[in-house]
């Protein structure tokens, strides 16, 4: 598929997600990085978002809970180019009833080429990257070209 360049502003839209067994770790991580996260627009799946907002005082737009459709809502926002970064503290040791939704979320994040952190260490690397607070361009699918080819 052909690609085009998508501009991501210095002020990012960041999705924060955590499986149940990882929620406290994400809360602690968010508290440690509150100053770095404050200038950005924050989204989260339902329970995680409400817990993060309560514990950190950050303004977080909480979507539905992951198993109730929140992962798919985030995937939709990624496809609409409204999410720039996904931080997902994922538990690889426990199956969740919405594992297919999680797989779909990861697939969409990969299709739209956004940075993804799946644990504390990768989130630390992402947050400390020189590009984190800069405007950048990323290659994304040329959906308009794709659609034009399909309709020709």
Curated annotation (Swiss-Prot):
Residues that coordinate or bind substrate: 19, 23, 45-48, 65-66, 98
GO molecular function, one term: methylglyoxal synthase activity
EC number of this enzyme: 4.2.3.3
Domain called MGS-like: residue spans: 6-152
Superkingdom, natural source: Bacteria
Protein name as catalogued: Methylglyoxal synthase
Taxonomic source organism: Actinobacillus pleuropneumoniae serotype 5b (strain L20)
Designated gene of the protein: mgsA
Single GO cellular component term: cytosol
């Amino acid at each position: 598929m052909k690609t085009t360049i998508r501009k991501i502003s210095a002020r990012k839209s960041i999705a924060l997600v955590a499986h149940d067994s990882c929620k406290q770790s994400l809360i602690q991580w968010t508290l440690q990085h509150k100053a770095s996260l404050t200038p950005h627009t924050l989204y989260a799946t339902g329970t995680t978002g409400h817990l993060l907002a309560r514990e950190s005082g950050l303004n977080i737009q909480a979507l539905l809970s992951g198993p109730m459709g929140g992962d798919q809502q985030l995937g939709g926002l990624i496809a609409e180019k409204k999410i720039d970064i996904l931080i997902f503290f994922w538990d690889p040791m426990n199956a969740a009833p919405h594992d297919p939704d999680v797989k779909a979320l990861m697939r969409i994040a990969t299709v739209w080429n956004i940075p993804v952190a799946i644990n504390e260490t990768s989130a630390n690397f992402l947050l400390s990257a020189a590009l984190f607070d800069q405007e950048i361009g990323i290659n994304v699918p040329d959906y308009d070209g794709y659609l034009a080819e399909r309709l020709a």
